[in-house]
Regions:
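Nucleotide/phosphate-binding catalytic cleft detector across ATP-hydrolyzing
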Residues: 1-15, 19-207, 225-227, 236, ...
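Glycine-rich phosphate-binding loop of actin/hexokinase-like ATP-binding domains
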Residues: 204-245
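Glycine-rich nucleotide-phosphate-binding loops and adjacent flexible coil segments
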Residues: 241, 251-255
Length: 277
């Protein structure tokens, strides 16, 4: 059986990251290579501002991935793209359908509802993903409606949305300037939460915070599903720029932050001296 490969690109405010992995016959994914390229001011708050600069950075990342011994001489043709940014948020939509008497609900019926919800017009927003929250069959809540018989099915869906400019500029970079097809969009905070959070944490309820360079995304989980997403226009670069007030350039401030900073307070005061500050 021919091995399958999957490529993902993340276009962040501080760097462009790319990863390629192989999928074996059991569906197991093995990461083969990861590359990144720093960007400065060409992506702001998760939205591409300078298409040419981002195009060059993505091209370099992909070129290095293709040169990896585990990949060469294969060429990358399509990629999955991570989506985040200041405009990322969620909208709750309820959709109902009436079925013939005593109809067994199937995956096909569920997918029809999801498709209808995904094509819902949201003012000044593009729908990236649809996350089911709750299902009701004949007004009774059921965790999984597949296999249940009923006459009415109501779905409470969480639409993950962003400004059209996000996807439009991604398309300009990857499909118009570069020779790639977009295999799909991945909601970055949701993908990270699926890796970090346990099933119990999602079921009992928690808030997951994705702290980026210029944005911070908060995701609320309850009853094992995503309930809410909101994004704040601030991130780790705010800390870096505070450090530049000590009369050092941003690159040095970033290095100092990474070397000496900690997100977890240990209760003890520490004094650090940096040369030239």
């Amino acid at each position: 059986m021919e091995q399958k490969y999957i490529v993902a690109i993340e276009i962040g405010s501080s760097k462009i990251k790319g990863a390629i992995g192989s999928i074996d016959e059991t569906g197991t994914l093995t990461v083969l290579a990861v590359e990144e390229e720093k960007v400065l001011d060409s992506v702001r708050y998760g939205c591409i501002q300078n298409v040419d600069m981002v195009c060059n950075a993505v091209s370099q990342v992909v070129s290095r991935l293709e040169q990896d011994p585990g990949i060469a001489p294969r060429k990358i043709k399509s990629v999955y793209v991570s989506v985040g940014g200041r405009s990322l948020s969620s909208v709750i939509v309820n959709e109902s359908t009436t079925l013939p008497d005593e109809t067994e609900i199937t995956e096909y019926i569920i997918e029809q509802i999801k498709y209808k919800v995904k094509t819902t017009a949201i003012a000044d927003r593009d729908v990236i993903d649809v996350v089911p929250c709750k299902y009701f069959v004949d007004k009774q809540m059921v965790p999984n409606p597949v296999g249940v018989f009923g006459q009415t099915l109501t779905a409470k869906m969480n639409l993950i949305v962003c400004k059209p400019q996000i996807k439009r500029n991604i398309n300009r970079v990857l499909c118009e300037r570069l020779p790639f097809a977009i295999a799909g969009y991945i909601v970055r905070p949701v993908a990270i939460a699926d890796i970090v959070l346990t099933d119990n944490e999602k079921r009992l309820g928690c808030m997951f915070v994705d702290f980026g360079a210029e944005t911070t995304t908060e995701s609320i989980y309850k009853d094992a599903v995503l309930q809410y997403i909101a994004t704040l226009p601030m991130g780790s670069r705010n800390i870096t720029r505070d450090i530049t007030a000590t009369n050092c350039i941003e690159e040095k401030a970033e290095e100092f932050k990474i070397a000496h900073g900690s997100a977890i307070a240990d209760g003890s005061a520490k004094k650090t001296t940096a040369d030239g500050v």
